From Swiss-Prot:
Keyword DNA damage: yes
Chain spans, region Domain I: 1-63
Organism in which the protein naturally occurs: Mycobacterium marinum (strain ATCC BAA-535 / M)
Protein name as annotated: Holliday junction branch migration complex subunit RuvA
Oligomeric and partner information: Homotetramer. Forms an RuvA(8)-RuvB(12)-Holliday junction (HJ) complex. HJ DNA is sandwiched between 2 RuvA tetramers; dsDNA enters through RuvA and exits via RuvB. An RuvB hexamer assembles on each DNA strand where it exits the tetramer. Each RuvB hexamer is contacted by two RuvA subunits (via domain III) on 2 adjacent RuvB subunits; this complex drives branch migration. In the full resolvosome a probable DNA-RuvA(4)-RuvB(12)-RuvC(2) complex forms which resolves the HJ.
Region (Domain III), start-end ranges: 144-197
Functional note: The RuvA-RuvB-RuvC complex processes Holliday junction (HJ) DNA during genetic recombination and DNA repair, while the RuvA-RuvB complex plays an important role in the rescue of blocked DNA replication forks via replication fork reversal (RFR). RuvA specifically binds to HJ cruciform DNA, conferring on it an open structure. The RuvB hexamer acts as an ATP-dependent pump, pulling dsDNA into and through the RuvAB complex. HJ branch migration allows RuvC to scan DNA until it finds its consensus sequence, where it cleaves and resolves the cruciform DNA.
One Pfam family named in its UniProt record: RuvA_C
Family under the similarity heading: Belongs to the RuvA family.
Keywords: Cytoplasm, DNA damage, DNA recombination, DNA repair, DNA-binding
Gene that produces this protein: ruvA
Length: 197
């Protein structure tokens, strides 16, 4: 998986940036606020999430790991794909989104194009306990705040597992072994998911 990119910015468009790293130009989808920090011809570093589908591999870029983790958490909501997750992060910054979820502010969530009242209510129900309070760097309390969680979930999603499935397996592994490393947690989560098939 590609977790971050550093290199020269070749192009900045409305919804993506092209960054050259080791002679290869990578197209990275990003929010307008992230794109506003990038200038053509300068060096940049983005934290990324790589989403692998049957017919595509897409990179999504973020200014920090916290926002990337929030993006991956949004993908766990039924009916929320990468485009809708990016739209949500385009309308709300990480703290604003955390606050809206903590307060159950359906009106704030429906400002996102593509999210209606039902979708906003579902987001509140499914994410309220997974996302920490506004101002918190942890994406969720206890097990979900484990530093190993995000890379393991990202790797599982990259291998084709549903985000919700990946999160549940990872949380189960980390609840049983609080000292797990990224590689040991990934192996254990894959083992769990293999038994479930």
């Amino acid at each position: 998986m590609i977790s971050s990119l550093r290199g020269e910015v070749l192009e900045v468009a409305l919804d993506h940036v092209v960054i050259e790293a080791a002679g290869v130009g990578y197209r990275v989808n990003a929010t307008p606020s992230t794109l506003a920090t990038l200038r053509q011809g300068t060096d940049a570093r983005l934290i990324t999430a790589m989403i692998v589908r049957e017919d595509s591999m897409t990179l999504y870029g973020f200014v920090d790991g916290e926002t990337r983790d929030l993006f991956l958490t949004l993908l766990s909501v039924s009916g929320v794909g990468p485009r809708l997750a990016m739209a949500t992060l385009s309308v709300h910054d990480a703290n604003g989104l955390r606050q809206a979820l903590a307060d159950g502010d359906v009106t704030a969530l429906t400002r996102v194009p593509g999210i209606g009242k039902r979708g906003a209510e579902r987001m509140v129900v499914e994410l309220r306990d997974k996302v920490g309070p506004a101002g918190s760097a942890a994406t969720a309390p206890a097990v979900n705040g484990h530093t190993v969680r995000a890379p393991v979930v990202e790797a599982l999603v990259g291998l084709g597992f549903a985000a919700k499935q990946a999160e549940e397996a990872t949380d189960k592994v980390l609840a049983g072994d609080g000292e797990a490393t990224t590689s040991s947690a990934l192996r254990a989560a894959l083992s769990l998911l293999g038994k479930a098939r």
